[in-house]
């Protein structure tokens, strides 16, 4: 891992780290205020594909988090950027609530497949339509490949198993744009003036949050909330820089040891 420099930026995951659906992680709002009172730059990074950035922001505001839209970098944004770069017409396999983030993108007569978490659309007919497009040479763009995520009623399948099914059936590989891709973390830092070696990532997903960030040159703090399961910290190499109980504990560590 690269030589450490003074901490300048903290990237924070949202779902599972600051909140679970419409409930905040206890103490998270106050911890965020304490972090903001320091000199570090705070940005929020999320793989959520269940809602648009605007809907997500409204949810966070209702939970009394002091967060602005320009501080959030989502995998939906990364997917839209790639679609525009490739100049393709995507079949959008995403939740209807995420569609506003693709406003203005041409989707008729699709020649690409973009897939996120879309429980209402993950049925045979729709997946078979995507399968046929891919067989005809359409690129497969995965917003992310998370295995599962945390809901109020327990763990639930993420888009990863469905992306993998399409890859398997068509003998192709998806281009993944969200966490844990290195480019996602670097894009999140773009315009901040901060380098990965000056950054800490806090999240509840050992692979996508912590492993991805550490592969990009950051330090990763794994929190035991959200989708965390016992011994997750042993699933990645190198191990997390730190594993702690929750976001407030992560902030305590940063304030006491990294500033």
Curated annotation (Swiss-Prot):
SUPFAM superfamilies noted in UniProt: HAD-like
Gene3D superfamilies found in the cross-reference section: HAD superfamily/HAD-like (3.40.50.1000)
Keyword Metal-binding found: yes
Annotated keywords: Coiled coil, Magnesium, Metal-binding
Cofactor binding note from Swiss-Prot or TrEMBL: Binds 1 Mg(2+) ion per subunit.
Annotated positions binding substrate: 13-15, 46-47, 179
Key word RNA-binding present: no
Residues that bear N6-succinyllysine: 50
A GO MF term: enzyme binding
Entry cofactors: Mg(2+)
Family: Belongs to the HAD-like hydrolase superfamily.
Protein name as it appears in the record: Haloacid dehalogenase-like hydrolase domain-containing protein 2
Gene: HDHD2
